[in-house]
Structure formats: C-alpha cells, structure tokens
Amino acid sequence: MSQMDPDAVSKAFVEHYYSTFDTNRVGLAGLYQEASMLTFEGQKIQGVQSIVAKLTSLPFQQCKHHISTVDCQPSGPASGMLVFVSGNLQLAGEEHALKFSQMFHLMPTPQGSFYVFNDIFRLNYA
C-alpha cells in the first residue's frame, strides 16, 4: 500500500463524515468499531450501537455543518491520524449557527481505510 497523504485523507474523511451526519446519521455506524469512544459534550459513550444511538437521538432532525478548519497530524506507530475540526452547525429553523470543535483519532483498518477510534465533540459557547 502506498503512503497516503494525511491531509488528503483527513479532508476526504471530514467531507464524508459531515455529509453523512447531515443526511443519514445511521450511516455513520460503519465509521466506528466496538472499541471506539465518543465524548459528546462531556458524556463518554463506547461501542458502535451506543454511539449511533446517541447521534440519532440528538434533539434535531436536520442540520448542516459548515467546516472552517481541518488540521491533521500523524499519530503513533500504527499509522493513526489526529484530525481536529472547527466550524459552524446550522440547525433547521434556527437563526444563529452554533460554533463547534471536534477531534477524531483515526486508525487504519486491514482493508486500507480508516475508522474512528476516538471522537470528541464540543459546542463552543463564547
């Protein structure tokens, strides 16, 4: 397998993650594994089913993420990647967008793609 450009991989991942979140949250299940952990506004959730249950139970049906920045670094000897995202979250029917930050720790799969090992999400109230 050729060496992948971390910036290109992280950009493609971010585009896929948020377009899926905005249109079909259940479809995010394939990006997590049983060892994956989500910390959502301080609440720690582990495992695919629990993470998807949390994301699909959020109190809004429609939203649109607008990404401002994507930063990435290689992480550790297992060819993982840290991806840090900031942007705005526009909820349907709301006038003002919410600022958010999200960090993903991506780990490679044997099939040559990546899964989300860690995911930390925070709204930025400032």
From Swiss-Prot:
Residues annotated as domain NTF2: 9-123
Entries under CDD domains matching the protein: NTF2
Residue numbers carrying N-acetylserine: S2
Tissue-specific expression: Expressed in roots, stems, leaves and flowers, and, at low levels, in siliques.
Organism: Arabidopsis thaliana (Mouse-ear cress)
Main location, first listed in the record: cytoplasm
GO-annotated biological processes: protein import into nucleus
Gene of this entry: NTF2B
Localization per record: Cytoplasm; Nucleus; Nucleus envelope
PROSITE patterns: NTF2_DOMAIN (PS50177)
Subunit composition and interactions: Interacts with RAN1.
Stated name of the protein: Nuclear transport factor 2B
Keywords carried by this UniProt record: Acetylation, Cytoplasm, Nucleus, Protein transport, Transport
